[in-house]
Amino acid sequence: MYIEKLRNFIEDFFLSGPVPANTHIAEYTASLVFLSLLIAAIGAFTGIRLAIIMSRCANPRHRRWLHGAGALAFGAGIWSMHFIGMLSYEMDMKVEYIPSLTFLSFVIAALAAWVVLYISQQKRYGGLRLFSASLLLGIAICGMHYTGMAAMKMDADTYYIPSLFFASIVIAISAGAAAIVIINHLQNYTG
């Protein structure tokens, strides 16, 4: 029974076989893609800067505020990049977004950013801890992205090509590892 449910879920989620002839191919609006990258850079810069200030702050209460503000800035940058990127995808159909799922995707991004800032504050972490944190962060980023995709209401079905789906997970985990290492190094070498 559970095997059958899992098989049905996989068949409904992943595209099996060749891409159908009636697949909708769309284009991106370049100016919105650029805007999404700019907002992501501003969010990352703000989150990293707040993490650096937090690492030098002696007051625990102020550290908590800086941690929360940094997570919101970083998370908002991540989420905005993805959401604006989705808006830039021009389709010849009406697309709406389910507010609760859209908000949930933002919460996932902010929590992932909170974890990154928490891990980056640790003075020492080995390979296993970095891998675990990167894995958690990558899964959270994918969760944010695919929750945002699930929030789309349109007159079409969405399927994912398995190789690209799993590549997105590997990329998200790698980006998470890079973010943790970069933030940690910047805290050690800037003032």
Segments and roles (model prediction):
Residues Y2-G191:
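Polytopic alpha-helical membrane-helix bundles and their juxtamembrane interface segments
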